[in-house]
Amino acid sequence: MIIASKFGIGQQVRHKLLGYLGVIVDIDVEYSLEQPQEDDIASNATLRSAPWYHVVMEDDNGQPVHTYLAEAQLAYETSDEHPEQPSLDELAESIRHQLLAPRLRN
């Protein structure tokens, strides 16, 4: 079964509501964590059956934070350069480079 996702691994995105910049590091075809809490966005069955993304963002101190977000929570990021968050630019570039030129392992 092939599921189309709106975003790809290594792509920079923005959280629609909060505006945070992030980098997609993995994609699940549907919600795959433990049972969601009732007040969680994941309690919506329609959203649970759509793609979910593992996204690295930065906290207020510039430390990486792993988030798990529904496709509906994300928006395209038009710029690849963010002087205020260069580590996310570097992460996105590194992931894209690895996807284009994977290392062979014995």
UniProtKB/Swiss-Prot annotation:
One CC-aspect GO term: cytoplasm
Record localization: Cytoplasm
One Pfam family this sequence matches: YccV-like
BP GO terms, sorted: response to heat
Keyword Cytoplasm attributed: yes
Key words, A-Z: Cytoplasm, Stress response
Gene3D superfamilies for the chain: Hemimethylated DNA-binding domain
GO molecular function list: DNA binding
Primary role: Involved in the degradation of certain denaturated proteins, including DnaA, during heat shock stress.
Family: Belongs to the HspQ family.
Name the UniProt record assigns to this protein: Heat shock protein HspQ
Source organism per UniProt: Photorhabdus laumondii subsp. laumondii (strain DSM 15139 / CIP 105565 / TT01) (Photorhabdus luminescens subsp. laumondii)
Organism taxonomic ancestry: Bacteria, Pseudomonadati, Pseudomonadota, Gammaproteobacteria, Enterobacterales
Gene field: hspQ
